[in-house]
Amino acid sequence: MTQHFPTRQLRFFLTAPSPCPYLPERYERKVFAHLPLSDGATVNDSLTQVGFRRSQNIAYRPACEACSACVSARLPVTDYAFSRSERKVLARNEDLERHLVEAEATMEQFDLLRRYLLARHADGGMAEMTWPDYVAMVEDTAVRTHIIEYRTRPSDGGPGELVACALVDLMSDGLSLVYSFYDPTLGRRSLGSFVILDHVVQAGLAGLPYVYLGYWVRGSEKMDYKVRFSPIELLKAEGWTLMSSRDLRPKDELPGL
């Protein structure tokens, strides 16, 4: 697959090995480049299509020496058929309001993020995120970025309660979910799944063909949720390949095997 980058030649760097946050007893390395401020959106689009992810003004992808478990994943909007359970998730959250806001950090968002991290990822690297860290994650961007806030409908004329947020990049061919978080006490709403499903809906309404989910890591419980969405496309050596959830389940989990 050949990609032509519409900017001065990018310089790529390689990180030193560090413990893998997803798989035990493994080490990760990443190749990364700084996104140019002049045409960062266009460069990020091209890099995302070949497996990179954005973090602030850096685009990176895994470059591990003895492991290739991290695989870029995206949902094909046109081909996506919502399952019965997914339609129920969408229906359970019909009472929420969606607000598109500028990529500007607020303390309300940060408070929700802290509650989410402490409940769901207390042992992860982001658990110690500070307010300046969050501001940088949201606002340090060279691409078209915004935040989707999901709120309950207000009863007194003021803003409703913030229950979920998604930091999203608007790309030429889709929406890229950079990071999402939600109220961990509202389990019945399945807010994590809802945010992804709602972005499939919104991408379809906008005529965008893909929703990018980042990396699926086979064998990582933290990342297994991504392949519950089907159909899904994974970036393989031969390019983006359409898969079903059945294709990605271990053989010992398939009926009759």
Swiss-Prot record:
Is the keyword Ribonucleoprotein in the record? Answer: no
Record's Gene Ontology CC terms?
A: cytoplasm
Xref: InterPro entries? Acyl_CoA_acyltransferase, Asp_Glu_LeuTrfase, N-end_Aminoacyl_Trfase, N-end_Aminoacyl_Trfase_C, N-end_Aminoacyl_Trfase_N
Enzyme Commission code(s) on record: 2.3.2.29
- Top-rank EC class of the record's enzyme: transferase
Annotated GO molecular function terms are: arginyl-tRNA--protein transferase activity; leucyl-tRNA--protein transferase activity
Report the protein's function: Functions in the N-end rule pathway of protein degradation where it conjugates Leu from its aminoacyl-tRNA to the N-termini of proteins containing an N-terminal aspartate or glutamate.
So what family is this one in? Belongs to the R-transferase family. Bpt subfamily.
Instruction: Indicate what this protein is called per its UniProt record.
Output: Aspartate/glutamate leucyltransferase
Q: Which species is listed as the source? A: Phenylobacterium zucineum (strain HLK1)
